[in-house]
């Protein structure tokens, strides 16, 4: 049974927000929130058409950040604080793409969790 598609409400947001970038070895997730933590826009490499090993490239990270930033910019966001988590390859490209999309980056903070010798890491790949 088909559902009725509703038009998404355009809500104006405060000009200051936070960008959470999670760059894993397999994918890149970018979530833009207001200062209270409510999601304004989000994007991922898979959502932007990248499949498989192309999802963890710097270019995929750039496209993903641009898509999320453009949507937030259209809703009225201008200044962002960036929080980066993970060891992925597209961390720097994501920040540059945010600045290129018109958002003014105020602070950059690395919140990658570091173990105090916790779980044993996966074994090294031999190709």
Swiss-Prot record:
GO BP, sorted A to Z: translation
SUPFAM superfamilies assigned to the protein according to its UniProt record, in alphabetical order: Translational machinery components
Keyword vocabulary terms for this entry: Ribonucleoprotein, Ribosomal protein, RNA-binding, rRNA-binding
Transmembrane segments: none
Pfam families found in the cross-reference section: Ribosomal_S11
PROSITE patterns attached to this UniProt entry: RIBOSOMAL_S11
A Gene Ontology cellular-component term: ribonucleoprotein complex
Recorded GO MF terms: rRNA binding; structural constituent of ribosome
Function noted in UniProt: Located on the platform of the 30S subunit, it bridges several disparate RNA helices of the 16S rRNA. Forms part of the Shine-Dalgarno cleft in the 70S ribosome.
Family recorded in the similarity comment: Belongs to the universal ribosomal protein uS11 family.
Subunit annotation: Part of the 30S ribosomal subunit. Interacts with proteins S7 and S18. Binds to IF-3.
NCBIfam families for this protein: PRK05309.1 (NF003698), uS11_bact (TIGR03632)
Protein name (Swiss-Prot/TrEMBL): Small ribosomal subunit protein uS11
Species this protein is from: Prosthecochloris aestuarii (strain DSM 271 / SK 413)
Name of the coding gene: rpsK
């Amino acid at each position: 049974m088909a559902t009725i598609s509703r038009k998404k409400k355009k809500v104006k947001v405060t000009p200051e927000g936070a960008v959470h970038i999670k760059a894993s070895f397999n994918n890149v997730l970018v979530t833009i929130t207001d200062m209270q933590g409510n999601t304004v826009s989000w994007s991922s490499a898979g959502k932007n058409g990248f499949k498989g090993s192309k999802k963890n490239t710097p270019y995929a990270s750039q496209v993903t950040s641009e898509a999320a930033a453009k949507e937030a910019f259209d809703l009225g966001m201008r200044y962002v604080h960036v929080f980066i988590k993970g060891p992925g390859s597209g961390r720097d490209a994501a920040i540059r793409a945010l600045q290129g999309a018109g958002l003014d980056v105020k602070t950059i903070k690395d919140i990658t969790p570091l173990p105090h010798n916790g779980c044993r890491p996966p074994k090294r790949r031999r190709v």
